[in-house]
Amino acid sequence: MKQKIFILLCTIGICISVHAKKYIVHSPDNKIKVSITADKQLIWSIDYNGERILTPSAIQMNIEGLKIQPGINPVVINAKVDKINAEQIAVVPVKQKTIRDQYTQLTLICKGDYNIIFRVYNNGAAYRFETVLKQSPIIVNSETVELNLIDGCKAYWP
């Protein structure tokens, strides 16, 4: 009997550990790699030329009145990758009339009427939450943005 319970607990532990979904998206020039893990939290990390520059960092939101909070125990329904190579007309005058807009975009479509969009450019990476909530207004109580930089890294803050 004890052996059956032990085997059952091991099987449950393996199933739970497999639950975490991992996604990777690269910059168009393949120098920047963004890794995303959707488990108890939404975690991202960034590598540049194979060297880790952002260690695993959590991102999440707390929206008033929602049962499912973006980034907390995320359930990814679908993942979509788009490669964009376009030119935008410069609104603010710069040397060139147009600005090249080239990036790889990963959209994680999640249960709970929200998506997380990651964009990886040749010179950086960004994310944003996108909702399709029908309630109005939407009140964001808080947003968690961890930026766990590597030791010895310098950051310039405005």
Question: Where does each model-flagged region fall?
Answer:
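N-terminal accessory beta-strand-rich subdomains and adjacent acidic, glycine-rich linkers
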Residues: 22-158
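Bacterial Sec-dependent N-terminal signal peptides
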Residues: 1-22
